[in-house]
Amino acid sequence: MKYESKSLLKIVISYMLFGFFWIFSSAEILHSITRDMSTYIILERYKSYFYVILTSFLLFKMIRSSYFKMEETNRKLQQDIVQSFITALEFHDKYTKGHSEAVASYSTEIGEALGLKGHELDDLYWAATMHDIGKIIVPIEILNKEEKLNDREYKIIKDHSKIGYEIVSKNDSLKKVSKYILYHHERWDGMGYPEGLKGDEIPLLSQIISVADSWHAMTSKRSYKNQLTCEEAIDELINNKGTQFAPKIINVFMDLYNSNEDAFMFEKSH
C-alpha cells in the first residue's frame, strides 16, 4: 500500500508540473516553431488537443511502469510468503522436503503443454507449490505411520486440503488459488474428497496437480511405502485413467514423459 501511494503521488505531481509548464510555456514554444501568424493561430487553436494527447501518452507510460513495478513487488512478497509456508511444512515433516517443488515443476510442464499462459500458469505454479500446506496441522506420527490408518487418522489426513484452503484463502494475494488446493484430491469418478466432485466439475488446475502429486508420491521414498519404479508408476497412472485421474491430463503427461523422461525423475536430479 505504501508503494502504491508513492507511485500515485509521483504520477499526480508529474502531471501537475507538466500542466503548469504547458500553461506558462506553450505560447513561447509555438512562437519558436513558427513566426507566421496564420500558422500560429492554427497551432494555438489545436494546442489543447495536443496537450491532451501528449499527457495521455505520458500518463499511460507512467501508470504502465508503476503497474509492472507493483506486480514485481507483489510477486516477490507472494514468493516470500509461500516459501515461509513451505519451510514450515518441511520442518514439520522431513519427508515432504522437495515434494512441493517437484509437484510445482511437473504441474507447470503439464500446464504449458495444455496451453496455459500468463496468470493462469502462475496460479497453477502457486497452487501446486502449496497444495499440501494443510498437512502442517497433521501430527507427524500420522503423516509417517507405517501401518494402515484408522478411520480417525484417515479423516485427519483428508482434512489437510480443507485446512490448506483455509490458510491460503486468508491471504489476499493468494486466495484466488485456494480452490485448486481444496480440490486436488478429488477423483474423476467422483469418489474423491472433500466434496466428491466428478469429471470436469473438478477445476482444471486441480486435475493437473492431482496427477503431478500422485506421480511424485509414487516415485519418491517414504517411511510408510515402497518407492515405485517409473515403469510401475506409469502403469498406475494408466490403470487409474478415467477413474482417479482426468483422461486428458494423463494423455498429456504420457506425451511429456515419453518425449523427456528425465524431466519427470525429480528424485534423481535433486
Tell where the protein language model's regions lie, with residue ranges:
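Metal-dependent catalytic cores of enzymes that make or break cyclic nucleotides
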Residues: 86, 90-270
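Electropositive phosphate-/nucleotide-binding environments in soluble metabolic enzymes
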Residues: 23, 46, 50, 79, ...
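Generic detector of contiguous secondary-structure segments
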Residues: 15, 69-70, 163-166
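Cytosolic signal-transmission helices at domain junctions
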Residues: 65-81
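N-terminal membrane insertion elements
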Residues: 1-68
